[in-house]
Amino acid sequence: MAEKENTKRNRREEILQALAQMLESSDGSQRITTAKLAANVGVSEAALYRHFPSKTRMFDSLIEFIEDSLMSRINLILQDEKETFNRLRLILLLVLGFAERNPGLTRIMTGHALMFEQDRLQGRINQLFERIEVQLRQVLREKKLRDGQGFIHDEALLATQLLAFCEGMLSRFVRSEFRYRPTQEFDARWPLIVAQLQ
């Protein structure tokens, strides 16, 4: 029984990995059908539906992976790091680095892969970025509590600016067919970002 569960779990993971790889390839710029996905995995469409009731559920599973990966690591950063600018830097690098290591998933994060899918999926991605923005805003607000001095500008405005930087780098990565890495020249950009905050 346990072996059958492992086989089913492995097949589910194989399907999700194939979908992510297709999103990374040139197929990712077009609608990915279950027929194409089944052919890529080497199974029938019926076999796909034994593991996932719909393509939407496949995307849901990938979004869940993105959410879990980013939010759990953001929580670790907040737990381990106390200095405001280090926290912000690490959160930005986390989002950019995750996208760089997972180009297919970046198409989901930018909404590019969801254009032909249910609106609810885009809503989940919107919520993810709102959660990241809330975390950035919280880090910015805590500076006043930690250091006794806040920022000149409103923390909500600054958090939006930081998130816009991330989203812009992800968009550039997808638009360039993954040529321009999101973390490329980050160390050179970071002082410019800090200057905007102060």
From Swiss-Prot:
One of its GO terms (cellular component) is cytoplasm. Residues 119-144 form a coiled coil. SUPFAM superfamilies: Homeodomain-like, Tetracyclin repressor-like, C-terminal domain. GO terms for biological process: cell division; negative regulation of division septum assembly. GO terms for molecular function: DNA-binding transcription factor activity; transcription cis-regulatory region binding. The keyword Ligase does not apply. Keywords: Cell cycle, Cell division, Coiled coil, Cytoplasm, DNA-binding. It is found in: Cytoplasm, Nucleoid. It comes from the Bacteria. Residues 9-70 form the HTH tetR-type domain. Pfam families: SlmA-like_C, TetR_N. Residues 33-52 bind DNA. The keyword GTP-binding does not apply. Required for nucleoid occlusion (NO) phenomenon, which prevents Z-ring formation and cell division over the nucleoid. Acts as a DNA-associated cell division inhibitor that binds simultaneously chromosomal DNA and FtsZ, and disrupts the assembly of FtsZ polymers. SlmA-DNA-binding sequences (SBS) are dispersed on non-Ter regions of the chromosome, preventing FtsZ polymerization at these regions. Homodimer. Interacts with FtsZ. Belongs to the nucleoid occlusion factor SlmA family. This is Nucleoid occlusion factor SlmA.
